[in-house]
Amino acid sequence: MSKYLVPVCASISLVAVFGALVAMHSIVVDIDTMREEIVTGVHDMKVMSDDAWNRMIGFTKPSLDSESRSAAFASVFRNKRSAYPSQCNCDANSQGCPPGPPGPPGLPGGRGDQGPSGDKGRDGASGVSLAVTHHLPGGCIQCPQGPPGETGPDGDIGEPGFPGASGSAGQCGEDGAPGEAGITGEQGPQGEPGTEGSEGPTGQDGTIGGPGLPGQPGTPGWPGSQGEPGKNGDSGVDGEQGPQGPQGPDGQPGRDADNGQPGLPGKDGSIGPDANYCPCPARAKKH
């Protein structure tokens, strides 16, 4: 049991580390996405604020010169009443001064006659509403029409139209140039055998070729039938006498031989000296 504990714990730790890495990657991606959204929002806010400021400055440029800008800004940002003196003391210094700011509006006048209808107004530029409202002398300033905007994105694909009338047949085109040789295709299926052709003319005799290389040994043939007995050969020459062989072992004792024929009578012996009488031996019997 203990030998399986270490691999199991190591596998669990590896899975946990892998899950932590995946979660960390997801968090980093979310933070990066949020950062891009914040940067984009700040950039859009800066563009909107710059556009609003340029519009505020542009309202005063067409109708006011450089000498009366202070008066225009004075109408936008009004000074406090305590900044002016209690008495007018501008008689001696009023020579060559620019015109002052417009005075307060008068009492409402009577209703005038109905005027003619005005021309159709120009399309306003798309943008954001100004955060600062102010009163400009002479009412709204007629700004010139701006340059054409950028081309908008392509619209959605419209519904298919009705099929058009068939066009007239066009002129026949010229034959195209022959194309390059294509890749050799795979071998097609075997066709059916053709009809037997007519016998061709007799060919010329071929030249005798040189001797060919020796062929490989053939397989052994079947054993043939037994042949007729051959003629007796000539008698061989007697061989030389060989050396004497070793003495053989003693043979078995032979049987007793037959008695031979009686021998011839012997000659009489000489007379011996006298001695004791000795009888003569008996004669042998004849078989």
Curated annotation (Swiss-Prot):
Residues 1-19 form the signal peptide. Probable cuticular collagen-like protein. Nematode cuticles are composed largely of collagen-like proteins. The cuticle functions both as an exoskeleton and as a barrier to protect the worm from its environment. Acts downstream of the Wnt signaling pathway, perhaps in the formation of the adult cuticle. This is Cuticle collagen 38. It holds the Pfam family Col_cuticle_N. Gene3D superfamilies: 6-Phosphogluconate Dehydrogenase, domain 3. It comes from the Eukaryota. Residues 184-205, 238-252 have a biased composition (Low complexity). It is found in: Nucleus. Belongs to the cuticular collagen family. Residues 145-200, 215-273 form the Collagen-like domain. SMART domains: Col_cuticle_N. GO terms for cellular component: nucleus. Residues 98-107 have a biased composition (Pro residues). Keywords: Disulfide bond, Nucleus, Repeat, Signal. Residues 206-215 have a biased composition (Gly residues). Collagen polypeptide chains are complexed within the cuticle by disulfide bonds and other types of covalent cross-links. GO terms for biological process: collagen and cuticulin-based cuticle development. InterPro entries: Col_cuticle_N (IPR002486), Collagen (IPR008160). GO terms for molecular function: structural constituent of cuticle. Coiled coil: none annotated. The gene is col-38. Disruption phenotype: RNAi-mediated knockdown causes hypodermal or cuticular rupture, typically in the anterior body region. Abnormal gap between the outer layer of hypodermis and muscle and the internal organs, perhaps due to defects in cuticle integrity. Residues 95-287 are annotated as: Disordered. It comes from Caenorhabditis elegans.
